[in-house]
UniProtKB/Swiss-Prot annotation:
Pfam families, per the entry: YidD
Name of the protein in question: Putative membrane protein insertion efficiency factor
Any one annotated GO CC term: plasma membrane
Topology within the bilayer: Peripheral membrane protein
Database matches in InterPro entries: Membr_insert_effic_factor_YidD
Keyword Iron in record: no
Task performed by this protein: Could be involved in insertion of integral membrane proteins into the membrane.
Signal peptide (from-to): none
Keyword set, alphabetical order: Cell inner membrane, Cell membrane, Membrane
Species annotation: Serratia proteamaculans (strain 568)
Family per similarity comment: Belongs to the UPF0161 family.
UniProt-listed HAMAP family: UPF0161_YidD
NCBIfam families on file: membrane protein insertion efficiency factor YidD
Presence of the UniProt keyword Transmembrane in the record: no
């Protein structure tokens, strides 16, 4: 069962979606990565929560510049919580 999103994660995802609907269409396609940085941010926030998801999204956005070749850069998998004790 998936854990529910924290209120902070929901707010940040809402802000990213607002960016996707309002600002991104005005700028046109600029992201050099797949998935796009905004989709990456939503997935990272959903998978890892507000703190780690924000950190991953920030690192991704900072990599998205003309000197980086881009390409496929998925959100890392969440470590398995079923460790042997």
């Amino acid at each position: 069962m998936a854990s529910p999103l924290s209120p902070g994660s929901r707010i940040l995802i809402g802000l990213v979606r607002a960016y996707q609907l309002v600002i991104s269409p005005l700028l046109g396609p600029r992201c050099r990565f797949q998935p796009t940085c905004s989709h990456y941010a939503i997935e990272a926030l959903s998978r890892f929560g507000m703190i780690k998801g924000s950190w991953l999204a920030l690192k991704r956005v900072l990599k998205c510049h003309p000197l980086n070749p881009g390409g496929d850069d998925p959100v890392p998998p969440k470590p398995d919580d079923n460790r042997e004790h």
